[in-house]
Amino acid sequence: MTADNNSMPHGAVSSYAKLVQNQTPEDILEEFPEIIPLQQRPNTRSSETSNDESGETCFSGHDEEQIKLMNENCIVLDWDDNAIGAGTKKVCHLMENIEKGLLHRAFSVFIFNEQGELLLQQRATEKITFPDLWTNTCCSHPLCIDDELGLKGKLDDKIKGAITAAVRKLDHELGIPEDETKTRGKFHFLNRIHYMAPSNEPWGEHEIDYILFYKINAKENLTVNPNVNEVRDFKWVSPNDLKTMFADPSYKFTPWFKIICENYLFNWWEQLDDLSEVENDRQIHRML
């Protein structure tokens, strides 16, 4: 499936979308001096700056392990999903920066078993952004390193980078061994979604999110052994189970998961046996 590179709902262009669209790479690097230009990036997973020693109030009361993870180097983007440089997870998730248009790359994985059930997780209480909320199997960020960046700049290379990051994070968050992920199923790239959402103060999200389905092979399973610092709970659900959860006010969901469900998920789910009509959409779907 192919399409134009950009899509806005109902043809609408918000003032925020215009702000992000009009920023050049030079504008981004000037506005955010913490961003390391792509050619000068250290090719390391994390910044050498220690959030633990910063004394910043934005981390007051938060879990030490989660604070360390805020040093990870995310991929800072322009409007067209071109990598501009490396920015720490902290810098990329502060609302004061997001309000100025700072954008980064992310991925969202949806794992389905042989019965067509989707693996959901409830984010741990310790998470700095969107704690305790239910969401899809795994949501995180490719890092600004060679294996996850897509150095050639082509979409297929970026997809490979997102999948490499997904394999890493499925192990880190859910304890799914990397060798199992690589051999017991297959990833399918669906599309990219561009959205912005505030979290708890002072945090938020502004991402181009690579949507990845993963179908477990027939008669096989994946080991799920969650990292309690990342995942509070998990469950396998059918479409009807998920709709029941949405109708129950005791369940709270991440904003990106709600966007994906409201616009795409249930239609995609119906085509799970043959995703050829819906996968590999080259368009960036703007939800701003």
Curated annotation (Swiss-Prot):
Residues 40-49 have a biased composition (Polar residues). The active site is at C139, E207. Pathway: Isoprenoid biosynthesis; dimethylallyl diphosphate biosynthesis; dimethylallyl diphosphate from isopentenyl diphosphate: step 1/1. Its main location: cytoplasm. It comes from the Eukaryota. Its cofactor is Mg(2+). Residues 102-259 form the Nudix hydrolase domain. 3,4-epoxy-l-butenyl diphosphate and 3-(fluoromethyl)-3-butenyl diphosphate (FIPP) act as specific active site-directed inhibitors of IP Pisomerase. One of its GO terms (biological process) is farnesyl diphosphate biosynthetic process. Gene3D superfamilies: Nucleoside Triphosphate Pyrophosphohydrolase. Residues 33-58 are annotated as: Disordered. The modification Phosphoserine is found at S7. GO terms for molecular function: isopentenyl-diphosphate delta-isomerase activity; metal ion binding. It is an enzyme of class 5 (isomerase). Pfam families: NUDIX. It is found in: Cytoplasm. Mg(2+) binds at H93, H104, E205, E207. Binds 1 Mg(2+) ion per subunit. Substrate binds at K89, R123, K127, S140. Keywords: Cytoplasm, Isomerase, Isoprene biosynthesis, Lipid biosynthesis, Lipid metabolism, Magnesium, Metal-binding, Phosphoprotein, Steroid biosynthesis, Steroid metabolism, Sterol biosynthesis, Sterol metabolism. Present with 25500 molecules/cell in log phase SD medium. Belongs to the IPP isomerase type 1 family. Isopentenyl-diphosphate delta-isomerase; part of the second module of ergosterol biosynthesis pathway that includes the middle steps of the pathway. IDI1 catalyzes the 1,3-allylic rearrangement of isopentenyl (IPP) to its highly electrophilic allylic isomer, dimethylallyl diphosphate (DMAPP). The second module is carried out in the vacuole and involves the formation of farnesyl diphosphate, which is also an important intermediate in the biosynthesis of ubiquinone, dolichol, heme and prenylated proteins. This is Isopentenyl-diphosphate delta-isomerase. It comes from Saccharomyces cerevisiae (strain ATCC 204508 / S288c).
